[in-house]
């Protein structure tokens, strides 16, 4: 059987399961006849659920290797949607963005990007609806069939401005399952706080096999919003000419992530991930980091603007965006790690661009990020540039 026929059958299975799921979890906005729920034994199982593990592993591995770009990569997500055994093997094969440089599942948006090369995305701004959409890819395609990653909506309040970040461009409710976090600015628009929404799944884990009646609403899982970063734009009191200057203190990312050797950091992350802990608590490890300062793990990573150079002929400040930015704008920036000279870090770490953002057209901007930032963190930093900052510009 060819790989295309397998993927076609998988799509049919996914659509069938999706129909059952939609009927079971539909809201009470429509009146349905009172019918007896069929027993679980009578529900038809997927014909692919009984495949030998070796064959199943080979099939999913082939799908993972062949479908590397969206929208074709949706086939990998379909494999994880068939049944529990398929989902388990798919999660074993699909590597995290840090290792493969690809975004597959929604959880990938909150995982660090690759170390070697950045993940390239672009942002579309809609002034009429005050929304900002993050897409996966170099630039907008002609078919406009780009993969949507995240969406944000600006909500102005009396003393602050909120940017609600969601997985959907149509639902920005903070009680929705698509809500992933928010960015909040102060009154002057110079200080921002990034909040990461975390769902406590202890209730779901305690009763994994519990099945709800179609008329019974699913229990709402409690959410825990934690601060993962703070962004500060420097005030330009003298109104001098020049680009905006900003600092981003990433509370959830230690400074050791960019100074220690990758093998050491990976070992620490594996040790932390293998240790169970309650949601919201921080796990500490006694593994030593080979740096001059043993407290690097306690210091948050701080990002700062990469210093631009003044171009005499163009009469503007310039940065080397390597062709990813084509329009001069006060919003354009490149962020590098702020590393003290006493830490004896490699010279390339001082110049390594972790996040860059810039304009390429009307209401279109590129966003390229890499380790240790995630797509969610990078997107939150970039949309902070859209807020009005009269006190920061010359």
UniProtKB/Swiss-Prot annotation:
Q: Which SUPFAM superfamilies match?
A: F-box domain, Tubby C-terminal domain-like
Judging by the UniProt lineage, the source's domain of life is Eukaryota
**Could you tell me which residue ranges the F-box domain spans?**
46-101
Q: Which GO terms describe its biological process?
A: regulation of DNA-templated transcription; response to fungus
Tissue distribution: Ubiquitous.
Q: Where is the composition biased (Polar residues)?
A: 26-44
Output the Gene Ontology terms for molecular function: transcription cis-regulatory region binding
| Residue numbers spanned by region Disordered | 21-44, 200-225, 268-297
Query: Which Gene Ontology terms of cellular component type are present?
Result: cytosol; nucleus; plasma membrane; plastid
The entry sums up its family as follows:
Belongs to the TUB family.
UniProt name for this protein: Tubby-like F-box protein 2
Source organism = Arabidopsis thaliana
């Amino acid at each position: 059987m060819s790989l295309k026929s397998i993927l076609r059958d998988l799509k049919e299975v996914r659509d069938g399961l999706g129909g059952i799921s939609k009927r079971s979890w539909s809201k009470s906005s429509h009146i349905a006849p009172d019918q007896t729920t069929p027993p679980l034994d009578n529900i038809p199982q997927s014909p692919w659920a009984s495949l030998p593990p070796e064959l199943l592993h080979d099939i999913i591995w082939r799908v993972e290797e062949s479908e590397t770009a969206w929208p074709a990569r949706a086939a990998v997500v379909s494999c994880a949607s068939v049944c529990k055994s398929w989902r388990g093997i798919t999660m074993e094969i699909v590597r995290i963005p840090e290792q493969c440089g690809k975004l597959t599942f929604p959880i990938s948006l909150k995982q660090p990007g690759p170390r070697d090369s950045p993940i390239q995305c672009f942002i579309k701004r809609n002034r009429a609806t005050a929304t900002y959409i993050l897409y996966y890819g170099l630039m907008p395609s002609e078919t406009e069939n780009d993969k949507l990653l995240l969406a944000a909506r600006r909500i102005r309040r009396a003393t602050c401005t909120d940017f609600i970040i969601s997985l959907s461009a149509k639902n920005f409710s903070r009680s929705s399952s698509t809500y992933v976090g928010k960015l909040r600015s102060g009154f002057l628009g110079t200080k921002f706080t990034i909040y990461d929404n975390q769902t406590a799944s202890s209730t779901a884990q305690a009763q994994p096999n519990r099945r709800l009646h179609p008329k019974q609403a699913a229990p709402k899982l409690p959410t825990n919003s934690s601060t993962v970063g703070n962004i500060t734009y420097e005030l330009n009191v003298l109104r001098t000419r020049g680009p905006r200057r900003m600092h981003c203190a990433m509370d959830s990312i230690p400074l050791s992530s960019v100074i220690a050797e990758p093998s050491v950091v990976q070992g620490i992350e594996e040790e932390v991930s293998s240790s169970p802990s309650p949601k919201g608590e921080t796990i500490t490890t006694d593994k030593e980091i080979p740096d001059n300062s043993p407290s690097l793990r306690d210091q948050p990573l701080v990002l700062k603007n990469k210093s631009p150079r003044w171009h005499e002929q163009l009469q503007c400040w310039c940065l080397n965006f390597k062709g990813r930015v084509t329009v001069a704008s006060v919003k354009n920036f490149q962020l590098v790690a702020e590393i003290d000279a006493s830490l004896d870090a490699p010279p390339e770490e001082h110049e390594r661009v972790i996040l860059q953002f810039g304009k390429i057209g009307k209401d279109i901007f590129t966003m390229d990020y890499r380790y240790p930032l995630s797509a969610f963190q990078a997107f939150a930093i970039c949309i902070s540039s859209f807020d009005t900052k009269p006190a920061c510009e010359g």
